[in-house]
Amino acid sequence: MATFPPLSMTRTKLAVLARQKLPCSSKSIPRAQLIKEKDDIDYYLEQNIKGLSKEEVAAHRNSYKKSICVDMLRDGFHKSFTELFSLMEQWDKLREAAQARSLFWLQRPLEDQPDKLDNFYHYLTKAEAAERKGYYEEVYNNLYALACYFDNSEDKWVRNHFYERCFKIAQLIKVDGGKKEAEAEAHMGLLYEEEGELLKAAEHYEAFHELTQGRLWKDATGQFLNLIACESLVRTYRLLSDRMLQNRDYKQAIKILIKASEIAREGNDRSMEGEASYYLGLAHLASGEYETALSVLDRYSEISTSLDDELSLGRAYEAMAKVLQSQGEMTEAIKYLEKFVVIARNNFKSLDVIQACTMLGDIYNEKGQYNKASDYFQQAFSTAMEVTKTTLMDETKVHYGIARAHQMMLTMNGYIESADMNSLNCLLSWKETRTQVEYDPILGEARKATEDNIYQFPDAQEETRRSPENQ
């Protein structure tokens, strides 16, 4: 068998040095040379094989949350660490409370979201460093940046925490004339408004409004803060008035809506002023002050006309018709409702068409004008079928059926009172076909309607089957 010569291998200097240290090596190496070789090995390792520092080892061993906390403490940001740790504890409490109520907890813990932890570290430490130097405006900006970052449905409780922190810091800022304090009041008002605590929200919005009066401050989008304050206060007053009206506290509701109207006028926003007038008019209507309600709603219609806002004008006509209907002025109410129907049709507002036609049908039904009542109820029913809303279809179908019954009532009574053979034949014929019939008192004969109003959709078999006369 042939024997191959040994392969020549190229070894690195480190490998050569290591092999020389092996027990099988026959050479005796002096101590000085060993020290030199060790230095060569250390240098080689340093240059070619990078080791891990203590910090890098800790980063691999610890969770990201722990690493962030350790960094805060090591860098001397003890307040930031305490605040972050407190937020994590609060999250645990919220989770336990949800589990106690047998709710499925979907929100991930903060420690599992490194991006959020990075933002905590960045802004909290910057805020703490600025606070040590007394730069409270910078503290506010960093805390507000955190509030904006957590402004979502999942982390709203974190946002609210930083809104409260901003509110406290804003009291210490004296160099901007109170702008940051005004912004903080607005944020606290929003916080309480979302939680349903409207009285507290109104207090903060009132402070916001007072601080911005006569100022030309703008927010990041370029909108005047005073206008935002007026809008927020008007909105909160309206929500408060809704609660008062539900409790039949009409005087307080009207009082607070008058304040809302005054603030809306101050904001120089005609649309907001008209909206405030609309709700004030409805409050006067609910309290039975019809003349005052008409006066206020007329103001709303004037504003809507000047703004060329047809939808608002339609709402004004509808509300004024309700007031006139309550006063018994049916003729005037009909005029406004007919205008409302035209506006609703022109703007493709099907629900408004249904509402207006139903109101007109009710009025004509009460007046005994059953043909017109039936016509408007039929329009409401047809529109409800177009929007395919089952609830509205059922409701308008009932109204239409009642109006049709009233429409036929006089005719049927005439047949019964006539007591002749022709009338009897007409009654029997109607019972067999159930089609619409009209009675001619002069000729004493029945004429079948050539086409029933309800059968306007020959292809819609299901709608025909659901019509009142087929029930």
UniProtKB/Swiss-Prot annotation:
- Keyword Glycoprotein listed: no
Q: Where in the cell is it found?
A: Cytoplasm, Cytoskeleton, Flagellum axoneme
Residue ranges crossing the lipid bilayer per the database entry: none
Primary location: cytoplasm
- Database matches in PROSITE patterns: TPR (PS50005), TPR_REGION (PS50293)
Write down the Pfam families for this protein, in alphabetical order: TPR_12
SMART domains of this UniProt entry? Answer: TPR
Kindly list the cysteine pairs connected by disulfide bridges: none
Keywords, ordered alphabetically: Cell projection, Cilium, Cytoplasm, Cytoskeleton, Flagellum, Repeat, TPR repeat
Q: Which cellular component terms (GO) are annotated to the entry?
A: cytoplasm; cytoskeleton; sperm flagellum
Which processes are annotated in GO (biological process)?
cilium movement; cilium organization
Q: Does the keyword Secreted apply?
A: no
State the TPR repeat positions. 92-131, 136-173, 182-215, 234-267, 274-307, 314-347, 354-387
Q: What does this protein do?
A: Axonemal protein which is implicated in axonemal and/or peri-axonemal structure assembly and regulates flagellum assembly and beating and therefore sperm motility.
PANTHER family in alphabetical order: TETRATRICOPEPTIDE REPEAT PROTEIN 29
The domain section of the record reads:
The TPR repeats are required for axonemal localization and flagellar beating.
State the name under which the record lists this protein.
Answer: Tetratricopeptide repeat protein 29
- Give the organism, scientific name: Rattus norvegicus (Rat)
Gene that specifies this protein = Ttc29
